């Protein structure tokens, strides 16, 4: 049941009650337990996360960072709604112009980010990811930070199989 409690609470939106009783130990069946079914949203750039870029990324999945958070290349900033990992630019700022209009600059409303606890972060990790724990924060990142090097390593791993 390790890793299932978070998924259960998400499915029931916090209203579920879960009880369990130990029955017996059984041998592990490969592929039966764990694993994340969705990919990660990975930052492509280093800098501060902006509200402008978070608004466009929200459509693609769940965000883990607040606006203004320092991010770096290879850092996992959210969970993709699909199975593959998606590299996104969360540091992109809005272009400023001299032309202003009343309807153009609307108030930006974004969803509250999902802040992962230590246990949730451990559940989220895949084989190619690391977790950094500091007194201030818990960050998830890819083992290989550079996007191009990650792609080369994935091709090499695929050809070796």
Labelled PLM ranges:
Residues 1-161:
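Accessory interaction regions appended to the cores of large information-processing enzymes
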């Amino acid at each position: 049941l390790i890793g299932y409690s978070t998924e259960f609470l998400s499915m029931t939106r916090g209203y579920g009650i879960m009880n369990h009783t130990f029955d017996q130990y059984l041998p592990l069946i490969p592929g039966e337990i764990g694993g994340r079914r969705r990919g990660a949203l990975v930052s492509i750039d280093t800098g501060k996360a902006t509200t402008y870029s978070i608004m466009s990324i929200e459509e693609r999945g769940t965000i883990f960072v607040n606006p203004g958070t320092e991010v770096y290349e290879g850092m996992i900033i959210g969970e993709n709604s699909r199975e593959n990992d998606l590299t996104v630019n969360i540091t992109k700022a809005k272009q400023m112009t001299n032309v202003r209009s009343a309807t153009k600059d609307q108030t930006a409303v974004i969803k509250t980010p999902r802040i992962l606890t230590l246990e949730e972060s451990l559940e989220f990790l895949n084989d190619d990811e690391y977790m950094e724990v500091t007194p201030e924060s818990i960050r998830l990142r890819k083992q290989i930070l550079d996007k191009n090097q990650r792609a080369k390593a994935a091709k090499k791993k695929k050809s070796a199989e």
